[in-house]
């Protein structure tokens, strides 16, 4: 057996984990068996925008996968449709549904518990049938792992009466000792996780919704999740690292939509210094342009905050600070080519007009008491103090820093997965369809190289020492990714926040999209991008989000090569998109696209209703996809090859067994 020195050293290291030929053989057999299993079901979701309850329901019902498992387990003779509906609701919301059932019936008898436990075991067995026993055991709740393992590996078709008696004794004991409710909750959560093997979040966990912190907590409970950062995610990440302009943007956006839950309750951000400053500085200013926006539901239920006038003052105060801070960044970085967003200095305080993109506009509000004519981008001493306090609060929020670490550990700007290319926004292009080159830290990048450069900069920003130019410049680039002219996450010439607040002329607020959005409609462009990123140009697809798919518009573009899964999960977009989000589901048989419709979750739990989802088949695979056909399988196959080489080394005497 001819082995290089380097290869022999590697096999020696590998032999420490597998010290005998028997152990190597066992592992090879195990891995080869895994390669023949069906691939797990993957779910792709984008643009959650902090809509926690809706996102959670989509996860719990796995875009209809749980209900499909129930239908596969039971015939109409075994269970009525109403009973299936109740079982599905119990799996989605076990704790809440148990409470509702007890409220309706007083108590639940042994017959109900016995039947329900056995039904749940059948559904769980179906949901976990693709996986090895080892993988299922690792996913089991610790307290019931042994019992669930015993129940899952029993079939009523078994001829052994002793085995049947054993299983029924387990179920009886669970009920007898008062653990049935806890067991129902545990096995229901196992089913929820089992029907989603991999979860891909294609950007924008954060935005105006008030539950982003809860979404992040939920994602951290999943073992196999990746995130392709969106523009809102990058903004919050930069804010968590203490970047002032990003902090101001996060606060302004939250305050505008009355989202104080994420800031104060979720992350413990102290808004008192900002509030006091706003009350003092804008005491006599009604700030009518800055009254918070209320959702349709809040308006219908008259759940407006009593202190809208105070909120408006805080909203204006942080908006003015934001525009100043952004101007400072743009003056520091002419290489961003965003001088068109430097307009404070053009303001005429006598005529109350301002010049933007070469046009003069009347200002709807010209009361800016902290604006300095000599340097309109300089913060007042009071504004400086406020921002120092806010930055301290963001950097020292334990929950926020935990979420930031998770985003860094599990996220990237793009990902190639099983031949598919995932990214949130766009690949910047020129008008002629060629890739756009941007200067990043003195070097020009386009396409994949550009996204790789930004990936690197975000990592640098996370570990570079504070108060260094390296950290400051890296954080400034993260802010640029939020709104920059050629940012792959923004995809717009400008974000017209200032114009929407202060300019009456709607044409001033028009946001021109990157040429990418025109070119990506063509299949040739999609194939070119897939090739650029090393994805599969023959069977691969681009999965993206960011731009809501309008009602009547197809989310599948470029002859099936591009799938946009931004379905408007935020309530304010439901009327635009005609739904409340998309989920792309890739199982071992086909690729499915589900468009979800709004649901009252409290009523759904009570009445055993489920979210209405329109499901279409995007692609049927020519044969069932196995583990060996996907990226994980290729990694396993390489592992098997290494182990076979180690086995040969043992047998040839090149390496001596350790046992």
Positions of PLM-derived features:
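Feature recognizes metal-dependent phosphohydrolase scaffolds
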Residues: 1-659
């Amino acid at each position: 057996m001819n082995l290089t020195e380097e290869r022999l050293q590697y096999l020696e290291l590998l032999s420490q984990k597998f010290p005998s030929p028997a152990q190597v053989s066992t592992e090879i057999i195990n891995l080869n068996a895994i390669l023949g299993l069906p691939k797990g079901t993957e779910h792709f979701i984008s643009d959650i925008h902090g809509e926690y309850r809706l996102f959670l329901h989509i996860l719990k019902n796995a875009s209809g996968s749980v209900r499909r498992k129930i239908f596969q387990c039971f015939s109409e003779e075994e269970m009525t449709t109403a009973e299936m509906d109740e079982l599905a609701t119990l799996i989605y919301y076990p704790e809440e549904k148990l409470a509702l059932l007890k409220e309706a019936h007083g108590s639940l008898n042994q017959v109900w518990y016995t039947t329900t436990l056995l039904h749940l075991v059948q559904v769980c067995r179906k949901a976990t049938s693709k996986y090895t026993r080892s993988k299922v055991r690792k996913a089991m709740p610790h307290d019931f792992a042994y019992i669930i393992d015993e129940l899952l590996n029993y079939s009523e078709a078994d001829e052994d009466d002793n085995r049947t008696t054993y299983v029924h004794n387990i179920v009886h004991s669970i009920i007898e000792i008062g653990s049935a409710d806890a067991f129902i909750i545990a096995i229901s959560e196992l089913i929820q996780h089992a029907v989603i093997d991999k979860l891909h979040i294609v950007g924008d966990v954060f935005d105006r919704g008030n539950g982003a912190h809860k979404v992040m907590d939920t994602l951290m409970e999943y073992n196999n999740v990746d995130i392709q950062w969106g523009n809102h995610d990058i903004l919050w990440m930069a804010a968590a690292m203490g970047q002032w302009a990003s902090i101001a943007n996060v606060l302004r956006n939250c305050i505008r939509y009355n989202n104080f839950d994420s800031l104060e309750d979720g992350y413990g951000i102290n808004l008192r210094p900002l509030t006091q400053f706003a009350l003092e500085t804008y005491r006599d200013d009604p700030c009518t342009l800055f009254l918070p926006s209320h959702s349709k539901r809040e308006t219908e239920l008259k759940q407006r905050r009593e202190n809208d006038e105070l909120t408006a003052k805080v909203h204006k105060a942080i908006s003015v600070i934001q525009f100043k801070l952004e101007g400072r960044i743009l003056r520091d970085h002419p290489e961003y080519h965003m001088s068109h967003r430097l307009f404070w200095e053009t303001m005429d305080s006598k005529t109350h007009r301002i010049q933007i993109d070469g046009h003069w506009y009347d200002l709807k509000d010209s009361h800016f008491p902290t604006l300095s004519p000599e340097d309109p981008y300089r913060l007042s001493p009071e504004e400086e103090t406020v921002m120092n306090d806010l930055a301290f609060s963001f950097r020292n929020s334990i929950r926020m820093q935990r979420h930031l670490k998770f985003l860094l550990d599990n996220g990237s700007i793009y990902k190639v997965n099983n031949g598919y290319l995932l990214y949130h926004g766009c690949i910047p292009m020129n008008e002629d369809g060629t890739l756009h080159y941007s200067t990043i830290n003195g070097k020009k990048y386009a396409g994949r190289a550009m996204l790789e450069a930004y990936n690197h900069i975000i990592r640098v920003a996370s570990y570079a020492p504070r108060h260094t130019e390296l950290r400051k410049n890296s954080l400034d680039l993260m802010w640029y990714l939020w709104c920059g002219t050629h940012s792959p996450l923004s995809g717009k010439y400008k974000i017209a926040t200032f114009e929407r607040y202060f300019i009456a002329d709607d044409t001033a607020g028009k946001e021109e999209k990157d040429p990418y959005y025109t070119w990506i409609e063509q299949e040739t462009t999609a194939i070119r991008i897939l090739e650029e990123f090393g994805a599969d140009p023959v069977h691969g697809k681009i999965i993206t989000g960011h731009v809501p798919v309008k009602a009547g518009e197809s989310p599948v573009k470029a002859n099936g090569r591009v799938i946009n899964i931004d379905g408007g999960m935020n309530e304010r977009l439901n009327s635009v998109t005609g739904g409340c989000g998309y989920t792309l589901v890739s199982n071992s048989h086909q690729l499915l696209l589900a468009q979800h419709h709004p649901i009252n979750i409290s009523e759904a739990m009570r009445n055993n209703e489920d979210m209405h989802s329109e499901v279409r088949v995007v692609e049927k695979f020519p044969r069932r996809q196995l583990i060996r056909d996907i990226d994980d399988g290729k990694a396993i196959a390489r592992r098997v090859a290494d182990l076979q080489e180690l086995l040969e080394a043992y047998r040839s005497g090149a390496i001596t067994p350790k046992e």
